[in-house]
């Protein structure tokens, strides 16, 4: 029996976003006061992300038993991430040159007030490759969870899962316990998700109330260029990848619509991480691949952030009349490839990453970030949406490469023919 439409989660979230926009526009002070609702929902999700990743990764690796397979899956995922990330960076660069959203501003960087971006610049710094990998290693096992650092939690989880796999049957009781604890945490996720419309309402009301729809007008061309480029990336680049793997990107996007609407309302792709992992298993991807690819992708496969990085840098150069040589642009691509790996799915992290990129590329003034500060929140939503679609597609692709994709179930679920049975199968797995 179908649910009444008003009880469907994505309908509730969509309605909440609409009401939030109206409240923020007509009563901006009240809209700004709704910020705690959005923040509370994000904190609830972040509270559960660490345990979810730990249990899923540990269970997946321990279930593999073969350490060569763990390395193979991780290697294939990283290879895919780097290839697709490069396409995203290049597409952002090409689109900005083609549509020229920054041409005509004629801004003198010396006249820009940098006080508003000081908090972002202070958090950003150029990070070498060695520093990046050293950061992945936590000071203690517990500090990884206390700080909520996805990469550090992933590191701890991989060591723990590998140890269980090596010990074998003697550790079976621990493996089974982790599986059971995982079910408890996913149940908590389902409970938290019920308040997603409230979180989306609060976050959207705050965004519109603080920044206002009027702040979009001067930079509509940049926003339009970014959204158009992201759509082209999803339909053409990810669409081609999906077609080669044997599924439709349109059907896939429709399949994760609830997660996308939660992300749209909160501007954070982390808000949908637990649900995305569950949906990928339901779709026919193996639990072990989902456990490795999805959490890793949240730091290494941020397609929307990559598009934004090169687009924002070139926009600032155009707006301040700075001519960049081919070598300088290639340097920007290389730097962005590294700095984007430090971004997470949290609201505002893309702007901090942009500051880190500009700090390493002195040709373009960091002060130019002031030009896009007012619209960054509106672009953050598109970044997060593109990121989550990219990570979902990556999971299906790596599962297919590992021959651990149930293609029959994939087809049935995307066509909406196997909702109940596939959910039961996923739970059994």
Curated annotation (Swiss-Prot):
Specify the superkingdom.
Answer: Bacteria
Instruction: Establish whether keyword Transferase is in the entry.
Output: no
| Keyword DNA repair in record | no
What is the first-listed, main subcellular location in coarse terms?
membrane
- Keywords annotated in UniProt: Cell inner membrane, Cell membrane, Membrane, Symport, Transmembrane, Transmembrane helix, Transport
**GO annotation, biological process:** L-aspartate transmembrane transport
The protein's matches in Pfam families, at most eight in alphabetical order, are given as:
SDF
TM ranges are 8-28, 44-64, 77-97, 148-168, 188-208, 222-242, 307-327, 355-375
Subcellular localization(s) per the UniProt record: Cell inner membrane
Q: Name one GO cellular component term.
A: plasma membrane
GO MF assignments: fumarate transmembrane transporter activity; malate:proton symporter activity; succinate transmembrane transporter activity
The membrane topology of this protein is: Multi-pass membrane protein
Q: What does this protein do?
A: Responsible for the transport of dicarboxylates such as succinate, fumarate, and malate from the periplasm across the membrane.
| Family stated for the protein in its record | Belongs to the dicarboxylate/amino acid:cation symporter (DAACS) (TC 2.A.23) family.
HAMAP family the record matches: C4_dicarb_transport (MF_01300)
The protein here is known as: C4-dicarboxylate transport protein 1
Q: Report the gene name.
A: dctA1
